[in-house]
Amino acid sequence: MSAFITNFQSPVEMQDLEDRFRRGGISNLNMLLHWRQFQPLEWTVDKQAVVGDTVLFMCAKTSVDHIERLYTQIRKAGQKDSALGRFAAAQQALYKKYAGCIVAFGRVAKEPFPTEAPGWDAPYWRSPWYAEIDHILLLDMPIHISQFRDFITVSRTGAITRLNTEQWAKLRTLIAT
């Protein structure tokens, strides 16, 4: 079995934020923080993932910039107090708290499968590979990238960063402490 980091974002474009709002105010971070409400949780994975692999969920550092830009657009349009504005403000606070952190981990429960319809109108991600994830554990103390960037380089071009045995062992030690 192996491990990989899946790096997820806040909504990137206004259409994505509006879509998330219309569908119950659910961002990627909300889905993860409240994963029991979304069982079975399906998430983007490495297409070579196998059942039993460990998935580490990391909130992208750039999420703060994206959600701030969208919230600024809403404020400039005079919609700060609208339902969408309140949703954006709440998302901004959440993403500020978790950006750059591994917030949870889980296990690949079923073989990866491709899909062309991820269920959202305007997804920012391009990977068609998903898998059902179970045994999710939210970290009481999220692990900031500054704690592991000296031994793991998180991919900036894709959502998935595969970990070698040594990297995973060091990261497990951080999680355990």
Regions found by a protein language model. Name each.
Residues 1-87, 148-156, 161-177:
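Compositionally biased, charged N-terminal/linker segments
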Residues 76-168:
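Aromatic- and Lys/Arg-enriched surface recognition patch
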